[in-house]
Amino acid sequence: GGLKFHFLSQKGYTGLANVSNKYDNYKVVPSIEGRFFKERFGVFIQANLEKRILTSNTFSASYNNKSDDASTYVTNSVSLSHLPRVKDRVNAAIVLDYRLSNGKIRFSNFGNSGITEVTNRSESFNIGGNSHFYSMGYSKSNLNMITNTLSFENQFSKAHMNFKFSHSYSESESPNNWSLNFYRLPAGLNDFYNQANIDPSSVIDAALINSSETNLNGVSSNNSFTPERKYMTSMDLKIPVNLGIKISAEIKFGGKYRTSKRSHRIESFGTTGTFQSPSERGAALMVIEYLGKPVNFWSPDIPLNWFIDSTFTYGDFLDGKYEMHYPLDFHMIEDLIFFCQDTIDAFASEGSTGAYARNNYWSTTNNYSGDEILNAAYIMATINVGQKLTIIPGIRYQGFQTSYKGVRGQQSPISFYNYDHTDTTITVDRPFWLPNLNVRYKPFKWFDIRMAYSNTISYPDFNTIIPRIDATTSAYVRWNNYNLNPSQSENLDLYFTFYENKIGLLTIGGFKKEITDLIYPWRFSAPGLAAIPYYLTDRLPAEHLNYTIETYINNHLVVDNYGLEIDWQTHFWYLPKPFNGLVLNMNYTHVQSEAHYPYVYAGATSATNVDTSFTDRLIYQPNHIFNFSMGYDYKGFSILVSMLYQDDVFSGVSQWQQLRSTTAEYKRWDIALKQDLPWLGLQLYSNFNNINNAKDKSVLQMYPDIPKSVEDYGMTAQIGLRLKI
């Protein structure tokens, strides 16, 4: 009984080299709880105020194949970005419960309000366009969420019932995201055009660097709103069944019904061409006048060197491997964006409509709305045969209906002002029966065997099934495959568990998965009228063009996935002092997988089609995962050193072997410490994360020294104080 008060206060540090607000991380968590009215009524109230600095430095590059050469790559573009990212968040929780004579009523409420601000300074190099861009972008996303759950649990004469009803609502709003870029043309990159095996760092080193010859290209902004609401109700019943002296059973059955409604709309504005275009001269001169610079009708260039922030430095960007130049002044760029937004009508009256106007294509093409309905029911039994054998058979029905409206359109040279499109709504039902069986045999107190057969499904991300089609002017079609089936996995598991005072808990086991309808991103070609199934329904594709289709597909072949897992948790209490405080946790998983990715490259006729199918690992599946932690406990002090290792992961599918990508192997070390203090239940703690500065990295599979992406967050640390009264 009585009230209990907990309080946590934490400060944090971000170790990335070029972060200016390294010590601005904090977290404060007060909570109070108690029981009243003879312990029947309980209250729990908690708040969480948090600020996190999540700045990162990134590298990315895009590659292509050189004609029909299957062994060399061509570098298309390279990009470097410095991304200061600040996330402010406030969470609140109120949980009320009332104990009945044979059950409990519980009412839970959780709320979250967060703001994420990102400033993006970037440089990009386009080899085909022989151009070098400097960009600055800003985004502010307001995310609000609330979840309410009412549950009723009660034991009737023989049946136990659990009823639950929940509601959740979330909305993400970006009131004014913007970006602006300068460019230099030519940029000294012609020598790399369509050349084989060019290291992307060579492109960066060769680019011509001169801020006075790099001029304003374009500005853009957008505002968006994305709401989502869900309702869910469920009920479960348990009934004991007596089947004899040595056999007891419990039957459990129930169901769930959930509805979801979501939508997205965006309004986008920007420059249709470039501020250096003669048609936008009027707008360029207005900008020059606003900036207080001399106006010359014959020289409307707006050079980058007017906007350089001399107080900002990129520091040791990605360990000094790449260099970024000329950081743009945030306040000057923001001021210019606001000027363009306020002067949109004046630009048009000067004949410079394309300098800044509503972009009808981007304001339309990604909008959507939709509903989802999930209904499920199950029945299962827990059968105990004596003290050693437990059998749990069951079957589950799950139906899932999606109904989404998306945009289908044809791009054209005037799509900026008038996008040719239609809205399409498609409804799809996906019913499944999912049987399962679990068996546990415990021949000894210190050993048991667990076997399981199960069927699981993984639904495609809703963004991939919205019936959107985006046909470009260059025979490239982005086609959302609304007929995607969920991936299904038939699973077999066998695990042996040992538990003994000195051994601790040791589990050794294996698993086998047969995956059908594996979902993965894909591009393929379709000549002329063969592209009809992927093209706009109100017109035909051009017969003389060979279309490239970008989409997600199901693999119609079965993917086999095998694995071995070892988990050991122990405390060396039996060793002599001071070693008796050591604790150890280890987990190793080895996975062997093979997937066949079918692909036919379309020729001019079916007779000239080329089968370029290939076999590789299961996408997004590492071969080796190893988690290790070693700790030491002594009275109120503890320290834990942990390591996470993950082997490279097959992450990019392509019919061209040299364009397939994998993540680089990842290894991260962390340290956690805590010390109980002798006053008021105080505890001091600290965490040091990623102390070896591991980076997220993907590379070309055939050329593991050639990066496709790199993301560096640096080391982080927290120190805090907990109070329990």
Task: Locate each region found by the language model.
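Outer-membrane beta-barrel signature, preferentially recognizing the C-terminal barrel domain
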Residues: 134-151, 370-373, 427-428, 457-515, ...
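Flexible glycine-rich, low-complexity coil/linker segments exposed to the extracellular/periplasmic environment
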Residues: 190-217, 278-365, 525-554
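Transmembrane beta-strands of outer-membrane beta-barrel pores
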Residues: 3-9, 49-53, 100, 111-115, ...
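Short loop/turn motifs that connect adjacent beta-strands in outer-membrane beta-barrel proteins
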Residues: 36-41, 102, 157-160, 241-251, ...
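Surface-exposed extracellular loop regions of Gram-negative outer-membrane beta-barrel proteins
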Residues: 117, 122, 261, 365, ...
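C-terminal beta-signal and adjacent terminal beta-strands/loops
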Residues: 271, 275, 645-653, 673-725
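Transmembrane beta-barrel wall of Gram-negative outer-membrane proteins
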Residues: 20-121, 137-151, 437
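Gram-negative outer-membrane beta-barrel transporters
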Residues: 512-514, 531-650
